[in-house]
C-alpha cells in the first residue's frame, strides 16, 4: 500500500468512525433538563388558550362544590424547540429508504428519552403536584403526559382558576372558567391540562 493510499484509508476510516459516533449519539441522545429555577407558587404565568370555548358567561351555571372529585386529569408536557426539530428530521428519515434510520421505529421509552421531558423535570413536576395534595396516578412512557387526580378546590388553588358548571344544548358540563396559571419555573415544560373540561353524564329518569 502506498503512503498516499494509507493516509486516505485512515482518513476514510476516521470519517466513518465519526459518522458512526454521531449517529450513535443521535440515537441515544437524552432529553436535557429545562426546569432550572426553584418552583415558586407565587411567581406565575398564564397559559393562553387553556379555557374551553364553550365555557362562556352565557352557559355558566355557577361554581362547583370544592369537594367535587376530578380524576384522571392529564398534565401535558411539551418538547423543546430543538426536540421538535430533531423529531421532524427523524420522522422524515424513517420514511426515507436511503436513510440509516429508515423504518427504525422507537419504543415509547426511547421516544421519551429523546423527545419527552427529562426524568429530572418529570420528577420536579410530580413532586410539585403531590406537594399541592394531588395524587399522581401515572407518567406516560413517552414522558408527554402526567395523569393526576384531586378535587375542584385543589385545582382552583393550584392553577389559579375557578371550576364552574356549564349548560350547553341541554347537557351539563364542568370546566375551568379562566385560563390556568402555573409557576413560571414550569413554563419551559408544561403545556396545559387535558380533562379539566368534561360532560356530566345525564342521570337516568
Predicted features, each with a name:
Residues 1-15:
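Bacterial N-terminal signal peptides that target proteins for export
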Residues 1-4, 25-30:
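Basic/polar N-terminal segments that are highly enriched at the extreme N-terminus
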Residues 11-25:
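Bacterial N-terminal signal peptides
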Residues 30-205:
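Non-catalytic regulatory appendages
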Amino acid at each position: 500500500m502506498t503512503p498516499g493510499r494509507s493516509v486516505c484509508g485512515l482518513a476514510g476510516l476516521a470519517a466513518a468512525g465519526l459518522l458512526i459516533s454521531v449517529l450513535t449519539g443521535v440515537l441515544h441522545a437524552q432529553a436535557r433538563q429545562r426546569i432550572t429555577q426553584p418552583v415558586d407558587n407565587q411567581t406565575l404565568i398564564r397559559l393562553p388558550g387553556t379555557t374551553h370555548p364553550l365555557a362562556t358567561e352565557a352557559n355558566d351555571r355557577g361554581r362547583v362544590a370544592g369537594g367535587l372529585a376530578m380524576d384522571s386529569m392529564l398534565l401535558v408536557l411539551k418538547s423543546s424547540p430543538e426536540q421538535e426539530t430533531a423529531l421532524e428530521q427523524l420522522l422524515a428519515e424513517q420514511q426515507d429508504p436511503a436513510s440509516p434510520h429508515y423504518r427504525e421505529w422507537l419504543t415509547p421509552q426511547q421516544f421519551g428519552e429523546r423527545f419527552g421531558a427529562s426524568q429530572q423535570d418529570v420528577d420536579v413536576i410530580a413532586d410539585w403536584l403531590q406537594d399541592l395534595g394531588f395524587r399522581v396516578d401515572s407518567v406516560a412512557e413517552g414522558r408527554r403526559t402526567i395523569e393526576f387526580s384531586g378535587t375542584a378546590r385543589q385545582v382552583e388553588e393550584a392553577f389559579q382558576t375557578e371550576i364552574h358548571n356549564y349548560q350547553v344544548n341541554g347537557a351539563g358540563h364542568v370546566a375551568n372558567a379562566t385560563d390556568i396559571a402555573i409557576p413560571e419555573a414550569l413554563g419551559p415544560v408544561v403545556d396545559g391540562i387535558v380533562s379539566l373540561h368534561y360532560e356530566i353524564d345525564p342521570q337516568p329518569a
